[in-house]
Amino acid sequence: MRHELIALAISLAIIGNVYPAAGETTLEKVKTSGVLVIGTRTGSPPFAYVNKSNEWVGFSIDLVEKAILPALSKKVDRSVKLEKKESAPATRIPLLTSNAVDLIAETMTDTQSRRESVDFSLTYFVTGAQFLVKKGTPIKGLQSIAGKRIAAQQGSTNARIIREKVPTAKLLEFPDQPAAFQALAQGQVQAYTNDGVQLAGLKAKAPRPDDWVVAGELFSYEPYGMAMRKNDSDFRNLVNVALMDAIESGRYFELYEKWFGAKGEVPYPMSGETKRFLQMQVVPK
């Protein structure tokens, strides 16, 4: 019995070190551990991906490292390290709700249904759904995919929209973006639907970019936010204020230019409307 009690005590101690205590806030967890754990992508350039030097980089990661992490370190009065875990549309909410990560920082659209499970930061990027096709493919937009084989990511808003708007399309869902693009490259599907900026990233990083076309007008509104556990207002406020400060100071736009500017990884010019929208989210101090 004594040995069983010792084993139980050790097990509980291990569990306690892995998972936050009941009722512990994210700020309390980070203050104790000195680590912020984010969920992000490995194959969504330029938001989050592994580059040719095997470095895990991207716009979303930069926003965390350059804006949120310094604010967090100041708040908890200690140096905070960043730990990254891979996330995908089907896994990111479970990663948050199971306490495996503290923040989702990638290409996650803020939706009403997702708000039932997690909270979101302010919008930090705006895009919309389109199609990636091989050059010469007759698909020109949503109106031309009936009966066609279309790839999408599992758990994505893009897959839901295709099912709702064009139920006659033959939708094939894949676990992540690399798998969906591979299916397209191998001819298993005739188009891959995702947010336009992500498709531009795939095209830019493809071995032969000129073989691919981002087709059609935007057929959805995709406001990206950073997701976190519900009812953790202090942490959510810290993230929002850090993003507001980055927008107000111009640091956000410097990072945008680095990744999406004319000389960036994926040129994707920001419209004047989008810039004004971002700035309008900054509330007075």
Which sequence ranges carry the predicted segments?
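Extracytoplasmic small-molecule ligand-binding "clamshell" domains
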Residues: G23-I104
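Short loop->beta-strand "edge-of-pocket" segments that line small-molecule binding or catalytic clefts
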Residues: V35-T42, V57, L142-G155, K170
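Beta->alpha turn/N-cap motifs
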Residues: T40-S44, K85-A90, N99-T111, K135, ...
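Periplasmic-binding protein-like
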Residues: T42, F125-V133, G196, A200-L243, ...
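Extended ligand-binding regions for polar small-molecule ligands
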Residues: I61-P70, Q143, K148-R149, Q154-S156, ...
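Acidic, polar ligand-binding/catalytic clefts
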Residues: E65, D77-S144, Q281-P284
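Short beta-strand-to-loop elements that line the ligand-binding cleft
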Residues: K74-A88, A152, A169-Q177, G216
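A ligand-binding cleft/hinge motif common to bilobed small-molecule-binding domains
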Residues: T91, A105-E116, I161-E164, P178, ...
